[in-house]
Amino acid sequence: MLMPGLLNDPVLLLGLMAFGALLLALPLAFWNLSGEPRSSTSRVVQLLVVAANLLLTAQLLWRWLDSGHFPISNLYESLCFLAWGCTFTQLFVERSWPSPLVPAATTPMALVCVAFASFALPDTLQNAAPLVPALRSSWLVMHVSVIMMSYAALLVGSLLSAAVLFTQPGQAMELRSSSIGSGSFQKAGLQTDGGTVVLEAAPIALSERLDNLSYRTITVGFLLLTVGIISGAVWANEAWGSWWSWDPKETWALICWLVYAAYLHTRLSRGWQGRRPAWVAVSGLFVISVCYIGVNLLGIGLHSYGWFFDS
């Protein structure tokens, strides 16, 4: 929450500046989506998201130098890192497809993370705190950063899948590209040019592009989540002598892994595309919310950052 001595705390100030940049970017992104997209507006939105990402980068580095450990030890740092991961993933996706739909779909997630961290958390969860002995390990950077980046990629991919559900409402969706390609199975058109037959590639539909980008982003997130779970098991065995203890966070991380494994299975083995796998990905949004925020706020288990049931 805001404090009178805000200017004396650069970490909180940088977080609020990132919030301001995202708050400006969001209405511009929706406005650019509502009418004919303007390249100048798209550029401003992108610059604001870049500014937010750089501000979050500076914030996390400042907290790292100030605390002496990787800035992921409490819910405030975790939320800011997740917002950084979401903005980074968003910018990476926009490089593949500079569409106004991408910032309109994904900017709200980063904004919610920074807003919750800046305005909803008590001071005790915003201030830096020393690490408990079990967390003083080189595995901290490896495990937690990979898990958080997997959440960011899965969230962005799932939001793009949610956008698929709102394209071509009430119409059958014809997707011509494969799940493992990028238009290699598109139907081509034949035209004649002075008696010569010309093979012309069919244009890629909006829903098709969204479907393909969400699939690729979720695939990256799933691989990162797999690496994160494995590294967490190795770390747990070193710290507590047990590979898996069915801690609430571990259980929900496994559920999250199974949901997105089902998403990939339906695409690769069943050939699902469009709205059906999109619904599976959207259900993953709920699972990640419970895994990340829900379990944390209950204050139960080894992975919690919460305060509701803390003594």
Curated annotation (Swiss-Prot):
Belongs to the CcmF/CycK/Ccl1/NrfE/CcsA family. GO terms for biological process: cytochrome complex assembly. It holds the Pfam family Cytochrom_C_asm. Required during biogenesis of c-type cytochromes (cytochrome c6 and cytochrome f) at the step of heme attachment. One of its GO terms (cellular component) is plasma membrane-derived thylakoid membrane. May interact with ccs1. It is found in: Cellular thylakoid membrane. NCBIfam families: cytochr_II_ccsB. HAMAP family: CytC_CcsA (MF_01391). The chain crosses the membrane at residues 11-31, 44-64, 68-88, 101-121, 146-166, 217-237, 251-268, 280-300. It is a multi-pass membrane protein. This is Cytochrome c biogenesis protein CcsA. Signal peptide: none annotated. Its main location: membrane. Keywords: Cytochrome c-type biogenesis, Membrane, Thylakoid, Transmembrane, Transmembrane helix. The keyword Nucleotide-binding does not apply. GO terms for molecular function: heme binding; heme transmembrane transporter activity.
